[in-house]
């Protein structure tokens, strides 16, 4: 498939997911892509356990999860993550942002709030956000990698049903 068609397919798929928030996460230390992926897994695992409780999360693995698509950019230097997140039922976008921000700062063991580590906004233009996070599609496909980090993302199996 041609490069622009692959990128367009990613964009269309992301738009169908109806994510609410766009979050960019950085770290003070240089991390590899794998380390950043593990950090994202830990962030969402801990957040889900805080919200749903450990036993409920384990019992209802496909229901009690935060729907998200994680893209990790940067190969060796300045590795960072772009995440599209669906706000949980019963939460406002602001509450969801605050929840993830507090958990991320706790995970990094950061005492002071540093704006470059966590930046979140409500998605107002899905096309623009989807294009932005998939800008490295061609580069990753040449390396036989997926632009979306499937290990730290969570997309329900039935997310394409309307």
Task: Please give the residue ranges for each predicted region.
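Right-hand nucleic-acid polymerase module
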Residues: 1-79, 87-162
């Amino acid at each position: 498939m041609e490069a622009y068609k692959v990128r367009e397919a990613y964009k269309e798929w992301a738009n169908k997911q109806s994510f609410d928030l766009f979050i960019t996460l950085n770290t003070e230390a240089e991390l590899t892509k794998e380390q950043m992926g593990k950090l994202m897994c830990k962030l969402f695992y801990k957040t889900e356990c805080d919200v749903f409780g450990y036993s409920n999360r384990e019992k209802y693995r496909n229901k009690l999860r935060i729907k998200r698509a994680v893209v990790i950019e940067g190969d060796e230097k300045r590795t960072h993550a772009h995440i599209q997140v669906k706000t949980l039922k019963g939460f406002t976008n602001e509450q969801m942002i605050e929840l993830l921000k507090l958990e991320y700062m706790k995970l990094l063991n950061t005492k002071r709030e540093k704006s470059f580590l966590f930046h979140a906004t409500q998605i107002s233009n899905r096309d623009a956000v989807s294009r932005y996070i998939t800008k490295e599609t061609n580069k990753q496909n040449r390396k036989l990698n997926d632009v979306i980090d499937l290990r730290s993302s969570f997309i329900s199996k039935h997310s394409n049903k309307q």
